[in-house]
């Protein structure tokens, strides 16, 4: 996992304070894996005070059992707290946990620490704050007398595969990470041939026959850590990854999903009545689509019960309608069922919210999806996509924002390939700052009008619904305090929401006590800086010339920031204009002075054209960025006593006007709101399922 999100844990102890776990000898089918206590790795790369000597994963597909062994050395005292606690998660609805060994190796001796009565069984809902409950259990044991230099060696088996897959096995394994590992071993035993695929130089397995079974073994030793780079796209598979799957095609995954999403009962009277009310109240097909979408998004609250097959199989539309909650697959099936009852073609569709185009390189399997949405085809044949888990969306049915998931697999018999999805949204943000400056050296009044479109409007609408006006006002004040000293809000932000057009406007008003600041290294000079902060917050300058990974861009994205300054006196300002066109973005800058009203107008605009910069294009892009970095802002300056500028002499002659400054660096960076999706992705990676 490239990003580990910090989660709040709701912990419920079951069966009292202590509970006995099952124990047994190591299964006879497991092959002992040797490892070195002194691997050839750079110990300066270690983090958190531990060295993982062995990561061993062996799976017997016929017995539906996974054997895990972890061997970790404690390097210093700081690691004892974490290394001395063993946690193993499993799903009790279809899995059984059995521990085999827990040993501490110290000075050539082995200390047996497997005491079944010392275990605690906990129910830890790691994603409860995001309304996801997977029912998993955690067996936890705290080891006594752990010391620096100890090697902790433990192993266990988890018996049972999720029955939803009906014996079709698939999984993924990583062979590196952000800390070095002495040895990584993956071994699979199967009575049928397996499809496998490795990424980034992962070698082919060692193949063997053992007791009539196909044996596949992958081993990596002295594993060096990955190099972390900021803004590496989530879809970029830059690590050694192994995929294994028994599914022979994406069509077979579709057939699996059709059976899992099959509606085995007619719609209930209550649900049918609700659909009939929608039909009676509307005549237009688009209105009906909109009504159903609004109902599923706003009236069916998001909550997922993911135990066992619940991670993949939706509840029936009748149950979801009655209980008024569901996760992504529940909401999607309900929405599709309601639309079909209205004679509108609709299907649930599986997506991966982060893999995007990389999903095309994966082996077919349902475990590589983490989300479910809806595809709708109107009577004219036009296609629309909707995410029923998003709330507070604006826009008509034809212009509802759909995230850039890129590819989706429609759950419809006969489908053999992905739908390619192009976002219709521009996600424009328009900000207009108006400064009215008092006399020179004094304060100013700042009025800000921000207009949000598409996904940006959806996000702001949800933000205003989830926060009090007082809290928002304080947060806005705190934000502008980064730019101006002693700034106070004059009134609460004023919200105007055109839901149908999905256009949300916010007006703010502030008083700045002292907007002028002394210029650095310039005696008797004061200045005012004007920064397009809506763009400034998006951007940063590359600090390296070359990269190993692509750079994520905020896409689709269009930001316009206009600044109007009412000056307290005449200024000698020259108009300027500049534009930059790049294959990944367009940039426009314009400065205009209107002398008869002493008004300065600044225009900054940037529009992304791609969602990333390739490694090959990075150097060229970096040069463009550095050329622009001195133009993202404007400063005016004068003497501290307000004397005539035309009479003030500098070393370079008469000081007359303002200058462009390097207020911030420039590059478009990704700012995707995950709301709850990050947590959903973490849950998916941990155990599988659609959220």
Model-found features: residue ranges?
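Cytosolic-side junction of a single-pass transmembrane alpha-helix
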Residues: 670-679
């Amino acid at each position: 996992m490239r990003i580990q999100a910090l989660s709040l844990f709701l912990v419920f102890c079951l069966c009292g304070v202590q509970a006995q776990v099952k124990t047994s000898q190591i299964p006879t089918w497991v092959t002992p894996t040797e490892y070195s206590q002194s691997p050839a790795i750079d110990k300066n790369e270690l983090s958190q005070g531990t060295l993982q000597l062995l990561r061993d994963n062996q799976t017997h597909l016929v017995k539906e059992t996974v054997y895990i062994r972890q061997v970790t050395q404690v390097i210093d005292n700081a690691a004892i707290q974490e290394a001395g606690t063993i946690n193993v998660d499993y799903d009790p609805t279809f899995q059984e946990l059995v521990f085999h060994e827990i040993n501490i190796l110290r000075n050539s001796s082995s200390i047996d620490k497997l005491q079944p009565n010392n275990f605690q069984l906990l129910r830890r809902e790691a994603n409860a704050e995001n309304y996801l409950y997977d029912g998993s259990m955690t067996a936890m044991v705290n080891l006594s007398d752990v010391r620096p230099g100890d090697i902790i060696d433990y192993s266990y088996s988890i018996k049972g595969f999720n029955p939803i897959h009906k014996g079709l096995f698939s999984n993924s394994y990583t062979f590196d990470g952000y800390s070095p590992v002495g040895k990584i071993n993956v071994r699979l035993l199967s009575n049928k041939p397996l499809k496998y695929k490795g990424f980034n130089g992962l070698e082919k397995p060692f193949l063997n026959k053992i007791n009539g079974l196909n044996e596949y073994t992958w081993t990596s030793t002295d594993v060096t850590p990955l190099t972390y780079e900021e803004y590496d796209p989530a879809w970029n598979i830059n690590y050694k990854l192994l995929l294994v799957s028994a599914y022979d095609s994406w069509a077979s995954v579709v057939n699996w999903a059709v059976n899992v999403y099959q509606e085995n009962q007619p719609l209930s009277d209550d649900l049918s009545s609700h659909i009939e009310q929608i039909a009676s109240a509307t005549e237009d097909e688009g209105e009906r689509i909109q009504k159903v979408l609004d109902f599923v998004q706003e009236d069916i609250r998001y909550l997922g019960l993911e135990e066992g097959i619940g991670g993949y199989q939706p509840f029936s539309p009748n149950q979801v309608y009655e209980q008024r909650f569901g996760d992504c697959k529940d909401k999607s099936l309900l929405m599709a069922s309601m639309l079909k009852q209205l004679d509108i073609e609709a299907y649930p569709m599986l997506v991966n919210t982060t893999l995007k185009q990389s999903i095309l390189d994966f082996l077919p399997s349902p475990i590589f999806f983490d989300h479910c949405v809806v595809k709708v085809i109107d009577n004219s044949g036009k296609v629309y996509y909707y995410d029923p888990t998003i709330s507070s969306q604006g826009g008509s049915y034809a212009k509802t924002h759909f995230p850039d998931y890129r590819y989706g697999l429609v759950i419809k018999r006969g489908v053999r390939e992905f739908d390619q999805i192009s976002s219709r949204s521009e996600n424009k943000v328009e900000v207009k700052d108006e400064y009215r400056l008092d006399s020179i050296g004094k304060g100013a009044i700042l009025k800000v009008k921000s207009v949000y479109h598409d996904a940006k409007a959806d996000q702001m609408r949800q933000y205003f619904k989830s926060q009090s006006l007082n809290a928002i006002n304080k947060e806005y004040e705190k934000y502008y305090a980064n730019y101006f000293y002693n700034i106070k809000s004059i009134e609460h932000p004023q919200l105007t929401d055109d839901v149908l057009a999905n256009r949300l406007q916010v007006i703010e008003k502030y008083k700045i006590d002292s907007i002028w600041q002394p210029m650095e290294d310039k005696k008797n000079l004061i200045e005012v800086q004007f920064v397009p902060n809506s763009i400034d917050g998006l951007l940063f300058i590359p600090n390296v010339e070359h990269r190993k990974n692509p750079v994520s861009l905020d896409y689709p994205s269009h930001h316009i920031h206009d600044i109007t300054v009412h000056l307290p006196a005449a200024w000698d300002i020259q108009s300027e204009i500049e534009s930059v066109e790049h294959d990944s973005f367009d940039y426009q800058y314009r400065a205009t002075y209107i002398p008869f009203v002493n008004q300065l107008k600044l225009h900054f605009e940037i529009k992304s054209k791609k969602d990333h910069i390739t490694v090959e294009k990075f150097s060229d892009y970096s040069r463009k960025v550095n050329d622009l970095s001195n133009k993202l802002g404007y400063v005016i300056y004068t003497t501290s006593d307000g004397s005539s500028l035309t009479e003030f002499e500098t070393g370079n002659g008469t000081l007359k006007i303002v200058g462009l400054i390097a207020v911030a660096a420039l590059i478009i960076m990704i700012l995707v709101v995950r709301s709850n999706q990050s947590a959903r992705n973490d849950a998916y990676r941990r155990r599988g399922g659609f959220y």
